């Protein structure tokens, strides 16, 4: 299983990302699990080192993607982070 953590505060972008992931899963037959977080603060608070990749929006309320990435790096050096 491939696990993706996604921090995105815009519901329309969340929907678009979900649709792309579902389409990719069907086309490739790869088992992908995506977890959405409303902002960087929620991601950092709930983070567990189970993700293969994190997709972070840079501009979000409470905690932006750059600050969230710095906090995650303190706990997990291996996860790939994409902005």
Where are the regions that the model predicts?
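Acidic, metal-coordinating helix/loop segments flanking the phosphotransfer/catalytic sites
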Residues: 34-53
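Short amphipathic alpha-helical segments
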Residues: 18-19, 48, 67-68
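Non-catalytic signal-transmission and effector/linker regions of two-component phosphorelay proteins
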Residues: 1-5, 15-18
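Two-component/phosphorelay signaling modules centered on CheY-like receiver
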Residues: 10-35
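Short amphipathic alpha-helix used as the core "switch/output" element in two-component signaling
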Residues: 45, 66-77
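Active-site residues of response regulator receiver
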Residues: 56-58
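A short, hydrophobic beta-strand element within the central beta-sheet of small alpha/beta folds
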Residues: 78-83
